[in-house]
Amino acid sequence: SAATIQVSPLQLQKAKELLNKEQPIENTYDSWKAFMEDTFTKQISSNLLQPSYSLTTKWDVYIQRIKAKMPLETEWKLLYLFIMYFHTFRLTINSLQSGQISGNARHFLQQELNDTLENMHYLMEQLTRISRPFAFDQFFLGIRQDLKELLHEENPYFHESINVYRNAWTHILKEKTWRKEELDSLQKQLNDQASVTIVIATIHLSLLTEHDEQVESLLHTLQPKDYPLINYWIRYTDEQKATPFILFIIQNIARFFEYETNYYRRKEFVSFFIPYVKKYCLRIHKMETFEKFCETCLPYSFIYYSSYLLQFNKHRKWVELYLYSNIELDYISSDDIKAVQQSDPKLLLPLFMSIVNDKIEN
């Protein structure tokens, strides 16, 4: 008689796992998303109290498992990679808000979140450059729906989320009808209680659909705490489209200072905007506007303003700036002093007098 083969329950379980592993995923957005969410839950969400070295290994396994299922054609691979990082971004934010997370796991996930953002932005730029197969459309429909989740203001990472939203609509969701539909949907949500993310999204889609006329009125609904979100449009749009944002900052810089009392955050804000304000004022030949902006932004604008005044030979104003700022002689560059001396030595007298008086008084 034929020998009977004994198979243990454990072997059966392993064989079942192998079969499940090898099942191909249906080539649809929803199947891919479900597979990712399931893998992320098993590897990451269920292990948020584990030591970070263990989480590092599980993160690598998670990424490898997803990549192993991807199609090999270049353009599809780019799309699938983008979708992988997009959902990883969403799922990581959800995990970071979990009550069951250790300090080490939080630190690890925050680092991964930054890397995920960089990868996503890189892939969006790559996807812009390839011709898009028609079959991408159902995937883009899924991305459009899931992007709406990023507009929830209670998400503590909403600055990063709104930038992902803006980048996706700029780089990969270029179909005019899609953009118009999105703008219509956003405008229905606009009211006095609308969240800042809805306002930012509406401004962005207005720019992309050439509806620039409502940008200015929407900007005025922003609170000073949200002004740093404006730098995205100044950095990434052309000079013409950036104009209303630069003007808004020029007009409202004092409001920002009333709100933001932290020295370094004020300095960072001014340092970002000042080169753009200068470029804009040069273009429209209104340097007095730039000077007024610099004066409002003192002391954070000091270095920029000082070099501008020397560059344009406004030596009297340069001396006044140093007198106002009470800066010691050691901190004034000898080249700067020579430049003023060659132009009009008398201008330096009040500066030297002030410094001598300080020495006598102290």
Where do the model's predicted regions map?
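Eukaryote-biased, non-catalytic alpha-solenoid scaffold regions
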Residues: I5-N362
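Elongated alpha-helical scaffolds
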Residues: S1-A2
